[in-house]
Each structure stands twice: as structure tokens, then as C-alpha cells.
Amino acid sequence: MRLNTLSPAEGSKKAGKRLGRGIGSGLGKTGGRGHKGQKSRSGGGVRRGFEGGQMPLYRRLPKFGFTSRKAMITAEIRLSDLAHVEGDVVDLNALKAANIIGVQIEFAKVILSGEVTRPVTVRGLRVTKGARAAIEAAGGKIEE
């Protein structure tokens, strides 16, 4: 069997109706568009969100919030991720080398999620209270 010899089962693919091909086809003349009006014209129709002149929903509702630029360069690291880092020192460069965070990340915080299995030294990262306790309980240390 070859890919170029495969074909769908007989009768499983029904041909689409061809529009504007005579009265007997059932879709001749107006081709399913009805008579006149904006939607019958070529390229006709209203833009997305248009409600016939009524104030549209997206303009009735208030704007809110913003996207923090700092959030784009900040990452959360789980305790379980620390096991994937080569060596005993965990810092930004080690996390980037292990593909745990992206290259654009400038700040990171270790959070208590999962468990740390070996002693590691966390350098230059922020650490939550729970994560700090877990790292120190495993024999590791945190350097600011």
C-alpha cells in the first residue's frame, strides 16, 4: 500500500452543490443568496461585531487592565524542575541551559510545587517561604 494509491471509500465523499448552474440544479439564478440586499452582493456583508448601528457589545463594555511588561520576563520555577538542572548550583543561566526557562527571562522565583531530591545551591533567584524550607530540608542552601 502506498499513500498515492489511497482513496476514500465509494460514496463517502459527496460533491458540493455548484451554484448558479441553472434552475434545475436547485441553486441557480440567485445561488442561495436570496434577492437584493447587502448580503447578496459580491463582497457584501457587515464587519465582525457590527450590530446594525446599535452600539456594539465591544464598545458598550469598559476597558480594563493592562499587560505587565515585567511579567513577560519573569518565570516561576517548581521545586521538581530543579532536578533537571545539571550540577549543584541553580541560577538563571543554569535554568536556561536546561531549557526550563526561555532566553528572554530575567527574573525567576522558585515555588513549592513537587519536591527537591538532592541538595542544591540556589543563587540569584527569589524563593518562597515553603520552597526555602524544602530546599534547606534537603540539605541545600539559598544565596541571594
From Swiss-Prot:
Signal peptide: none annotated. GO terms for biological process: translation. The keyword Transport does not apply. Gene3D superfamilies: 3.100.10.10. Keywords: Ribonucleoprotein, Ribosomal protein, RNA-binding, rRNA-binding. Belongs to the universal ribosomal protein uL15 family. Part of the 50S ribosomal subunit. This is Large ribosomal subunit protein uL15. It comes from Klebsiella pneumoniae subsp. pneumoniae (strain ATCC 700721 / MGH 78578).
